[in-house]
Structure formats: structure tokens, C-alpha cells
């Protein structure tokens, strides 16, 4: 029964793992609901900011902020939002693939690429990849604040102001639903114009008091910060959803494996009992 004993030990080990993955699934489900609430609270503000800024980009301002002006692209920057922890399926890998595809398109045109990395997984990946990181932040936990991000955002905005980058992108996982999280690459700077065709035909604009320069300087920075924060909370909700699904799959697979091992154990035990009975019968016959 040495083989059967080994199988019993393996079954016990898989059951312990199943308990862990089951607990992680429940924890991820709870955290996902909280992350969804946080995302739902911030999304209307981010969407409205994007709409207002898109309207401004369509307007005919005498004062043209540098964030509104297209310029020759020699260097691009990416703010890449990843997770701090693993065990969330292919969430990070799919995100990095999308970022690399976009980066490759620019590099083929001879454009330099710089990054600001949010989350330890992005830091580890692009350190091996050899990318130039201007800023890095991690360890924000399950309730990140916009204050945690201001440093990295400020570095990229200063690089843009100084002409060190000519275009800025935000890369994150957009939360669609529990089963679907979409890697997204959004252009942040220069500001993309609103794609509202009806709005474009009306040719209306805002009235600025006392003047557009001071207002735009503050508003455009808040816009970038709000979009990055929204990307972080969307990515956090995506992380918990992906982890919940991954842990459920692991728990289910552990159950299937336990069933298969139990069958093997029963067969081994049956074979052992049959052999013992055969030996007893053979011994009795010899007597």
C-alpha cells in the first residue's frame, strides 16, 4: 500500500490547496465589489472631465495651451498601470502585450519611448524588457488615492512641458464586467478632440472668466490626474475580477484532480486487497 499512501498524501495536499484557492476566491469577490463601488463613484467625474476637455479641444481659443497643440513626435511616453500582486490570470501579460504593440509601432518610426510605471508587476516586467522608466510607484493597496499618483503624473507632465516627450499615453485594463477586462491604450496628450460630430457642427465654445490661460493650466492638469486615477481604479476592479475567476478555476480544477486521484487510490486499494485475498487462498490451497 506504499503507492496508495502516496496517493492519500497527494489528495490531502490538493485538498489543502483547494481550501486556499477557495478562500482567495471569496476574498477577491469581496474586494471586487468594493473596487467596483470606488470605480462607479469616480467614473462620472472622469467621463465628464474627458467630455469637457474634448469640447475645449474643439474650441477656437486665442490662447493655445501646449497640451492642445499637435507637434512632431520624436519621443513618446506611456503611463502603464499594472497590479502589485499576481494570481490574476493573464491580466498583466495581456496589458503588457498591448503596450508593447503600441511601443513597437513608434520604435519602428525611430521614436524614443519612456515610461512611468504604476504597480510592481509593470516595474519588474519593463526592468527585464529594458525600457526607460522616468517614474515608478507601487504598494498603493486596495484603496489608492489620487495623492499616490501625483508624483508620477507630475514627472510625465514636466517631461511633456520640457519637450522630452511629444505624446503621452495611458495604458490600463478597462473593467467591462466580471468576465471581461479590456487592455486599453488611451492618448492623453496632446488632448484628443471630442468625437461628437453633432457637437462639432454647432461650433459653440465656453466663456472663460477672468481669462482662459489660468483656468486651462489648472484644468488640464486635473484632467490628466483624473484620467490616470480612473485608470488605476478600473485596473484594480479588473485585477480582483480576474483573480476571482482564476481562483474559481483553480478550485474547480483541484476538485477534478481530487476526483481523479480518489479513483486511482480506489483502484490501487482494490488491487492490493485482491492480491492479499489471492495470497490467502493460495496459502490455504497449499495446506
From Swiss-Prot:
Q: Spell out the subcellular localization from the entry.
A: Cell inner membrane
Q: Which domain of life is it from?
A: Bacteria
Repeat among keywords: no
List, alphabetically, the GO terms of the cellular component aspect: plasma membrane; proton-transporting ATP synthase complex
Cite a single GO MF annotation: proton-transporting ATP synthase activity, rotational mechanism
Topology in the lipid bilayer: Peripheral membrane protein
Question: What keywords were assigned to this record?
Answer: ATP synthesis, Cell inner membrane, Cell membrane, CF(1), Hydrogen ion transport, Ion transport, Membrane, Transport
What HAMAP family does this protein map onto?
ATP_synth_gamma_bact
The record's similarity note reads:
Belongs to the ATPase gamma chain family.
What is this protein's record name? Answer: ATP synthase gamma chain
Amino acid at each position: 500500500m506504499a503507492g496508495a499512501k502516496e496517493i492519500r498524501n497527494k489528495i490531502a495536499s490538493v485538498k489543502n490547496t483547494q481550501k486556499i484557492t477557495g478562500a482567495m476566491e471569496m476574498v477577491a469577490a469581496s474586494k471586487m465589489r468594493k473596487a467596483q463601488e470606488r470605480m462607479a463613484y469616480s467614473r462620472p467625474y472622469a467621463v465628464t472631465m474627458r467630455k469637457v476637455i474634448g469640447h475645449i479641444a474643439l474650441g477656437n481659443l486665442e490662447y493655445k495651451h501646449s497640451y492642445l497643440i499637435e507637434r512632431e513626435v520624436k519621443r513618446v511616453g506611456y503611463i502603464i498601470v499594472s497590479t502589485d500582486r499576481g494570481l490574476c490570470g493573464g491580466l498583466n501579460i495581456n496589458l503588457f502585450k498591448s503596450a508593447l504593440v503600441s511601443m513597437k509601432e513608434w520604435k519602428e518610426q525611430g521614436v524614443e519611448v519612456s515610461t512611468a510605471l504604476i504597480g510592481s508587476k509593470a516595474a519588474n516586467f519593463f526592468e527585464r524588457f529594458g525600457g526607460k522608466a522616468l517614474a515608478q510607484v507601487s504598494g498603493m493597496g486596495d484603496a489608492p488615492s489620487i495623492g499616490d499618483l501625483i508624483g508620477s503624473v507630475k514627472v510625465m507632465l514636466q517631461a511633456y512641458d520640457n519637450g522630452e516627450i511629444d505624446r503621452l499615453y495611458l495604458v490600463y485594463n478597462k473593467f467591462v464586467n466580471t468576465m471581461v477586462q479590456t487592455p486599453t491604450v488611451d492618448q492623453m496628450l496632446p488632448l484628443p478632440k471630442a468625437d461628437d460630430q453633432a457637437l462639432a457642427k454647432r461650433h459653440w465654445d465656453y466663456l472663460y472668466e477672468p481669462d482662459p490661460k489660468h483656468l486651462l493650466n489648472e484644468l488640464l492638469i486635473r484632467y490628466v490626474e483624473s484620467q490616470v486615477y480612473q485608470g488605476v481604479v478600473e485596473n484594480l476592479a479588473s485585477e480582483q475580477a480576474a483573480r476571482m475567476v482564476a481562483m474559481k478555476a483553480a478550485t474547480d480544477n483541484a476538485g477534478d484532480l481530487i476526483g481523479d486521484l480518489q479513483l486511482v487510490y480506489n483502484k490501487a486499494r482494490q488491487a492490493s486487497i485482491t492480491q492479499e485475498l489471492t495470497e490467502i487462498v493460495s496459502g490455504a490451497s497449499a495446506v
